[in-house]
Amino acid sequence: MDDLMARIRASSTMPGFMPPVTIEGVEYVDGALGDTGGIPIDGAQLDGYDRFFVVCTRPRDYIKNEVKRPQTLRRLCRHRPAVAEAIIARPARYNATREMLRDLESDGKAYVFYPRVMPVTNKERNVTKLRQAYALGMAQANAELPQWRVFLGV
């Protein structure tokens, strides 16, 4: 169980805000720094899947902006240059993955859930606000459930 908790913590460790998590001698940070910018569709594709149900936490028209001061970031992360470069590359990777999702959606190969309203950020800790955001998401999910069933064939 401790190993599972460490892996969960590592999956949400935001560089610059939290120290990396070490598992079996290897440091880990948030998976959003990977090849798809935080939308883990690549693993499913490598496993041979060709239809996807994706839940996004940003609205449909969201575009992630480039890092404003990459040189400053490189200095701050000088002991972890790969992390700095991944943070700098993340917006382009994320936006490319979102574009790929739009293409998959147009081809009928993806159902992408986009929130109509997202009243909290990923740094929110106020439990009341988090519960309100959860309730909004559940209401939207319940309204879209018939469409989900059609896409999933259930």
Task: Give each language-model segment a name.
Residues 1-154:
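Patatin-like phospholipase
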